[in-house]
Design a protein with these regions (language model features):
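Sec-dependent N-terminal signal peptides
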Residues: 4-13
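A structural boundary/capping signal
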Residues: 15-123
Length: 123
């Protein structure tokens, strides 16, 4: 019975997973957040999943920094917003038409406190 419960949990977890990056090797590369986000967005669009690349920029006191996320609605037909980067996918509670709010929420979920943040969707 114990084995059955464990197998059931593993199968159930596999059914509720979020999409994976088609170019997983990019996740290991340093400073590859933008090409990773673009590849993930294109992979989602093949399956008619709404997705955009969000570019966030900030000043850390010494120099300009930035990071890219893929923002997507998953599963299709649901209004559930997710953000993806090399840390993984996180469910976000923000409006898709407000890139700054999406970036702030994504940073908070990753325990990043960033002042003077700007954000926009990649065109």
């Amino acid at each position: 019975m114990k084995k059955f419960c464990i197998i059931s949990l593993v199968c159930l977890a596999g059914c509720t997973s979020t999409p994976r990056n088609p170019e997983a090797w990019m996740e290991r590369e340093i400073n590859a957040c933008l090409p990773t986000a673009i590849a993930f967005r294109e992979g989602l669009r093949k399956y008619n999943v709404w997705s955009e690349v969000l570019v966030a920029r900030w000043w850390d006191g010494k120099r300009s920094r930035g990071h890219a996320y893929t923002v997507y609605l998953y599963p299709p037909g649901k209004n559930q917003l997710w953000t993806y980067d090399s840390w993984g996918s996180y469910r976000s509670r923000a409006y898709t038409n407000n890139p700054l709010m999406v970036a702030q929420t994504a940073n908070l979920q990753r325990n990043l406190s960033i002042d003077r943040l700007t954000a926009e969707y990649l065109k």
